């Protein structure tokens, strides 16, 4: 295989890895918007909290002498999901439920306030400096090689792909076949009608925040291990990129969030490789603008009809 093709293949691997985590975070944005028509701008901070919780659990277990990689990561996942889900429920209960019937600008201000509070809370309690995470998966496989370049897949990339696939599959099955999943779909179609039919809409809305937070926590654990460093400010840009992925795929559409995340991740990887890392954010947001010019509702979004 030619060196140019191997280099392109390597960037595709990197893009799918990054896009998978964007898709996980984007799920939270798209589910909340799909039901209550609001954007949870504190969602990125939940991702950040998930990465910190997993770090603390892994560090504590390693101090106790446990050094099995999969066991440490599994414990990190469980702890991060539980704590992040509690934060997701709290954000809905404190930041959204009291202002749900108010103007959207008020809810937006409330969400931004929650984001700033969580960011500064972690900064004050854990410090504002970068924290290095222990590397638990160091293996890699050579997919193809030439004289000067080899395309590889790392163990951590495989873990990210497998965990993302399992999480997406579990969410799809839950939404499609479970009783609460059907309630979520009913609320997404018509919240008022769902309430009239006896569905506890408050519980469903809280559940969407919890599910979104759990997905963000999974992404936090994965990206923390992939990059090896975290800080209290990683949630802002990750949240913005995931929001971009959700809008790109069609805000309110779960498959759209998955597709948007993958497209965005691949676009970032290719732009970093063939242009410069300085342009990756420019390319990401320019791609969003171009897609919305052609498809204003995103790739899989549906146009909304508002009654006046």
Regions found by a protein language model. Name each.
Residues 18, 149-230, 254-259:
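Helix-loop-helix "hairpin" substructures at the membrane interface of multi-pass membrane proteins
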Residues 35-38, 42-90, 150:
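Membrane-embedded helix boundary and interhelical linker motif in transport proteins
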Residues 64-114, 121, 259-264, 268, ...:
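Alpha-helical transmembrane segments within multi-pass membrane transporters and channels
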């Amino acid at each position: 295989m030619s060196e140019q093709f191997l280099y392109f293949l390597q960037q595709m691997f990197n893009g799918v890895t990054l896009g998978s985590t964007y898709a996980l975070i984007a799920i939270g944005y798209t589910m909340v918007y799909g039901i209550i028509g609001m954007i949870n701008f504190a969602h990125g901070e939940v991702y950040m909290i998930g990465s910190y919780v997993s770090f603390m659990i892994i560090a504590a277990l390693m101090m106790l002498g446990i050094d099995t990689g999969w066991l440490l990561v599994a414990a990190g996942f469980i702890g991060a999901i539980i704590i992040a889900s509690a934060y997701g429920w709290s954000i809905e209960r404190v930041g959204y439920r009291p202002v749900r019937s108010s103007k959207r600008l008020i809810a937006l201000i409330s969400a931004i306030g929650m984001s700033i509070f969580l960011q500064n809370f972690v900064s004050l309690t854990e410090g504002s400096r970068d924290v290095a995470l222990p590397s638990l998966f160091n293996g890699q496989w050579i997919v193809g090689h030439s004289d000067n370049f080899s395309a590889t897949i790392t163990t951590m990339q495989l873990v990210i792909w497998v965990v993302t696939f399992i999480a997406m599959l579990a969410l799809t099955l839950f939404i499609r076949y479970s009783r609460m999943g059907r309630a979520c779909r009913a609320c997404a179609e018509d919240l008022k009608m769902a309430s009239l039919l006896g569905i506890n809409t408050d519980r469903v809305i809280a559940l969407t925040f919890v599910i979104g937070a759990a997905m963000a926590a999974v992404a936090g654990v994965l990206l923390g291990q992939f990059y090896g460093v975290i800080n209290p400010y990683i949630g802002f840009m990750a949240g913005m990129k995931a929001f971009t992925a959700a809008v790109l795929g069609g805000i309110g559409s779960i498959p759209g969030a998955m597709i948007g995340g993958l497209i965005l991740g691949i676009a970032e990887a290719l732009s970093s490789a063939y242009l410069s890392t300085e342009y990756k954010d420019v390319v990401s947001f320019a791609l969003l603008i171009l897609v919305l010019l052609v498809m204003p509702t995103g790739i899989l979004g549906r146009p909304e009809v508002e009654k006046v």
